[in-house]
């Protein structure tokens, strides 16, 4: 019998009220296209690290970032809805890509009044971006305090052997033009991820010197 993997506790990144992810007025999150998790209706504008790990992504608009835990779980925090269109206005990052953070560290501050006026919603989503890394996530309910209250418990997926991707396969390369002014973000990104999961392959994107799989 293999040993049990320890559960991962996710603290609330913001002070506010827990909201079921299915209730978020955006199908990308409500339908869990990005991943499963929870939402918070915030009372203030300070985002704390809900887990310890490495900042593996910080969006240019500073409204969203991803932390990878030591277990390999990627936690995406997305402040507000359609906040990418603010192009960083009202947001101040306190970390950079590659930084190591501990639970409770300050990640982002934002102007609550401005974001409330200029964005669709203040609802802040916290989701697991790589769902294959977990077996389940159990969100809490009610009011939570940023950096202090338990917001969810994650059961990591059992370790499994990965098949070797080396040799024997064909390589296909193509060019895609994205007319969306905000780029490959949110809904189009989630759609692409859903399509990619239908293939047993190593898929990489490259643009302007940046790459991602």
Regions found by a protein language model. Give the residues of each.
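Contiguous, well-folded functional domains in the mature portion of proteins
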Residues: 1-167
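SAM-dependent methyltransferases
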Residues: 157-175, 193, 197, 202-204
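Short amphipathic
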Residues: 10-12, 169-180
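A general secondary-structure boundary signal
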Residues: 52-55, 175, 211
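Amphipathic alpha-helical interaction surfaces in cytosolic regulatory modules
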Residues: 183-196, 201-204, 210-213
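Short beta-strand segments
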Residues: 73-77, 174, 212
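Conserved beta-strand segments of the P-loop GTPase G domain that flank and frequently precede/overlap
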Residues: 78, 177, 205-206
């Amino acid at each position: 019998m293999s040993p049990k993997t320890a559960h991962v506790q996710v603290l609330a990144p913001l002070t506010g009220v827990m909201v079921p992810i299915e209730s978020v007025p955006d199908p990308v999150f409500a339908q869990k296209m990005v991943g499963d998790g929870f939402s918070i209706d915030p009372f203030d504008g300070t985002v704390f690290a809900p887990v310890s790990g490495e900042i593996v992504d910080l969006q240019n608009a500073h409204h969203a970032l991803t932390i990878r835990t030591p277990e390999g779980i990627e936690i995406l925090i997305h402040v507000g809805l359609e906040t990418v269109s603010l192009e960083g206005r009202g947001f101040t990052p306190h970390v950079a890509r590659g930084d190591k953070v501990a639970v409770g560290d300050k990640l982002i501050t934002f102007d609550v009044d401005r974001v409330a006026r200029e964005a669709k919603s203040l609802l802040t989503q916290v989701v697991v971006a790589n769902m294959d890394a977990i077996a389940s996530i159990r969100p809490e309910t009610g009011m939570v305090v940023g950096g202090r209250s338990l917001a969810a418990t994650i059961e990591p997926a059992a370790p499994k052997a990965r098949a070797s991707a080396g040799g024997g396969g064909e390589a296909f390369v193509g060019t895609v033009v994205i007319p969306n002014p905000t780029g490959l973000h949110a809904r189009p990104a989630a759609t692409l991820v859903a399509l990619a999961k239908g293939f047993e392959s190593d898929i990489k994107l490259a643009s302007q010197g940046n790459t991602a799989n």
